[in-house]
């Protein structure tokens, strides 16, 4: 439920805030490639959830489709010269510093997610509301905050395409990776 709510929050909240903040010019490739891929993943989730269960096979298909998408995306963009697009500060950073920040970010993300889930469960119990409702609403909005922050920073840095790409990529990864891998591990997920 959190994944569904997060994807809705990404489109409804994050994209709305971005649209209010600035004029977004979208390239043709977005309509021809990126948007249809997100739509395919969303429809795949819809079809797989018609029986209210995401099985291991469903998870395998979603994750395999994600791997195909990643391969397609990398091979499509490999031809572009990305050297000019790399931030100068990143080029000057040492591998040690990047690894340290990645480790700190990963640990912070893990514990932040733990606090978010524990807090949401406690809140649901105290308010006498189902955990599913809290998952689709409060937790989903909470998990969309990083996308909102990244999109706003992209707008400030004049990278408007990145702000929309961030949302599309997040929605695709929520379905293909988070839900796909979870279904592979847990066998059955009830939606």
Language-model features and meaning:
Residues 1-189:
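Hydrophobic alpha-helical segments, chiefly the membrane-spanning helices
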């Amino acid at each position: 439920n959190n994944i569904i709510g997060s994807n809705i929050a990404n489109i409804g909240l994050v994209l709305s805030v971005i649209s209010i903040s600035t004029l977004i010019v979208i390239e043709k490739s977005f309509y021809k490639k990126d948007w249809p891929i997100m739509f395919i993943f969303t429809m795949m989730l819809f079809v797989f959830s018609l029986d209210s269960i995401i099985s291991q096979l469903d998870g395998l298909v979603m994750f395999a489709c994600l791997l195909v998408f990643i391969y397609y995306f990398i091979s499509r963009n490999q031809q572009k010269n990305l050297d000019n697009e790399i931030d100068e500060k990143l080029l000057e950073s040492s591998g040690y510093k990047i690894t340290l920040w990645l480790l700190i970010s990963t640990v912070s993300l893990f514990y932040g997610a733990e606090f978010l889930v524990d807090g949401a469960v406690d809140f649901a119990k105290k308010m006498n509301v189902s955990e599913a409702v809290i998952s689709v609403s409060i937790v989903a909005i909470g998990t969309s905050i990083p996308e909102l922050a990244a999109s706003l920073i992209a707008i400030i840095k004049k990278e408007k395409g990145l702000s929309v790409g961030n949302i599309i990529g997040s929605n695709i990864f929520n379905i293909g990776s988070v839900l796909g891998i979870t279904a592979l591990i847990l066998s059955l997920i009830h939606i």
